[in-house]
Amino acid sequence: MDTVALGASGPASTRLSLQLGDAQSGLRAVTESSGSAVVVHVGGDIDASNETVWQRLVTRSAAIAIAPGPFVIDVRDLEFMGSCAYAVLAQESVRCRRRGVNLRLVSNQPIVARTIAACGLRRLLPMYTSVENALAPPA
């Protein structure tokens, strides 16, 4: 996979070591692309203080994905994911589907699954336990 650092300068890394936008944002991300697929690995926190940075990251990364995709967002290294993060993902999922790309979320945290279910977002934000599973073609 080619590694692309969005919103940060300097060399890209496969580790979650890049700060996006404001160094105080608390959000780290690395975006990788391979063929039509794009994977974003995120860590840190997503809340109202960095919602704009999160929105920009998701939108720019999704734009790289080409149908049939998928566009995978790995949130396993997030320490906090506020409601604004789910709203951004749901909106981007709708935009991706219009382009023939499926947004897939990777998480092993029960709270993420419960939040998605409680908000009625299961169809828009299908969850996978690993990036490998999320990248696999549908059975």
Language-model segments: residues:
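General small-molecule cofactor/ligand-binding pocket signal
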Residues: 30-32, 106, 128
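Amphipathic alpha-helical interaction surfaces in cytosolic regulatory modules
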Residues: 45-125
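Acidic/histidine-enriched, glycine/proline-rich intrinsically disordered or flexible terminal extensions
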Residues: 135-139
